[in-house]
Structure formats: structure tokens, C-alpha cells
């Protein structure tokens, strides 16, 4: 990143910074402890409890959130499409960060549920990658 900031080509920097900002906003939404907010602000907590009342609803929520984050990352940084392991590694760190924040505000140790959440996060990331790959394959085939 430092090399990019020191480059003689400012147009490259103008392209990269908005993309990076979009990804940072996406990461902030993923990392934000909505469960904590639900405890502090009870009307919001009631909505969260209603939306994610079952284990399946919770899993679908995690999968959807990380699928959207993956789609955003792949759209903003297309080079990640050629490096699936980097893509998965970097964005799985967001899942680990999310679980770490949840453990901090809940004040407890790691449980089975937290590992299950990471698996659903990984599934969402893989779904995003497969969607982008499939879309690209269809687009190239039709040309």
C-alpha cells in the first residue's frame, strides 16, 4: 500500500482508494457487534431476536452476510478472482474477527457455536466466489 501511495501515477490511487473505502465499510458492517447493540437498544434487539430466532436463521444470516462481503471484495478487487486462497484467507480473517468481537462483549470462551459460525461464514465466501466465477464463465462463453 505504501508503494501505491508513493507512486507517480495518481490516477491509480484515485481508483484504489474508493474501492478500499467500500471494502472497509463492508468489513465494518460485518465486524460490528449487532448482538451487543441489541442488548443496549432493546427495540433493535427485538428485531434481531425475531429475525434470527432459530439456528437455521442464524446460519442463513451468517452465510448471507459473508456472501455479500465476498461479492463486494471480488467486485472491488478483481485480482482476488485469480487468487482464491488469498481471497478466502483474507476474508476468513474477518469471520475470525467477528467471532472475537462477539466473545469480547459476551465475556465467554470459544464454543462449538462459534466454530459453526465460521463454517457458515466460509460457505458464504465460497458461494460468492462460485457465483462470480460462474458469472464470468457464462459471460466469456457468450462472447
Please provide the spans of the model-predicted regions.
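Bulky hydrophobic segments
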Residues: 2-116, 122-143
Amino acid at each position: 500500500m505504501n508503494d501505491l501511495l508513493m507512486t507517480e501515477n495518481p490516477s491509480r490511487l484515485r481508483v484504489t482508494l474508493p474501492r478500499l473505502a467500500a471494502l472497509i465499510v463492508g468489513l465494518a458492517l460485518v465486524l460490528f457487534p449487532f448482538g451487543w447493540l441489541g442488548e443496549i437498544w432493546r427495540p433493535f434487539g427485538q428485531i434481531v431476536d425475531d429475525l434470527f430466532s432459530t439456528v437455521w436463521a442464524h446460519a442463513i444470516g451468517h452465510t448471507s452476510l459473508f456472501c455479500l462481503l465476498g461479492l463486494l471484495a471480488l467486485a472491488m478487487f478483481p485480482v482476488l478472482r485469480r487468487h482464491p486462497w488469498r481471497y478466502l484467507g483474507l476474508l476468513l480473517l474477518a469471520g475470525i474477527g467477528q467471532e472475537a468481537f462477539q466473545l469480547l462483549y459476551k465475556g465467554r470462551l470459544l464454543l462449538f457455536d462459534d466454530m459453526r459460525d465460521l463454517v457458515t461464514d466460509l460457505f458464504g465466501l465460497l458461494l460468492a466466489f462460485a457465483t462470480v466465477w460462474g458469472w464470468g464463465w457464462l459471460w466469456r462463453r457468450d462472447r
